[in-house]
Swiss-Prot record:
Gene3D superfamilies to which the protein is assigned, alphabetical: CD59
InterPro entries: Cytotoxin_Cobra, Snake_3FTx, Snake_toxin-like_sf, Snake_toxin_con_site, Toxin_cobra-type
Originating organism: Naja atra (Chinese cobra)
PROSITE patterns linked to this entry: SNAKE_TOXIN
Name of this protein: Cytotoxin 6
Length: 82
């Protein structure tokens, strides 16, 4: 009985992921990385002249402002920067 209870506690801890971390796509979407502590946004960066293809993707702490040449799109859920 104690073994069953211990197993349930361990499974619960693993499933809850107590130290939640964000996962963001890298430049090639099938590949993603787990963001470091404090990096709570995913981002996608485009060149304004060619918005069809992102130049960079990853984790970031603050979403940068877009400029005349570069556009940033940020989000805060797992792998949302497709």
């Amino acid at each position: 009985m104690k073994t069953l209870l211990l197993t349930l506690v361990v499974v619960t801890i693993v499933c809850l992921d107590l130290g939640y971390t964000l996962k963001c796509n890298q430049l090639i979407p099938p590949f993603y990385k787990t963001c470091a502590a404090g990096k709570n946004l995913c981002y996608k960066m485009f060149m304004v002249a060619a918005q069809r293809f992102p130049v960079k993707r990853g984790c970031i702490d603050v979403c940068p402002k877009s400029s005349l040449l570069v556009k940033y799109v940020c989000c805060n859920t797992d792998r949302c920067n497709n």
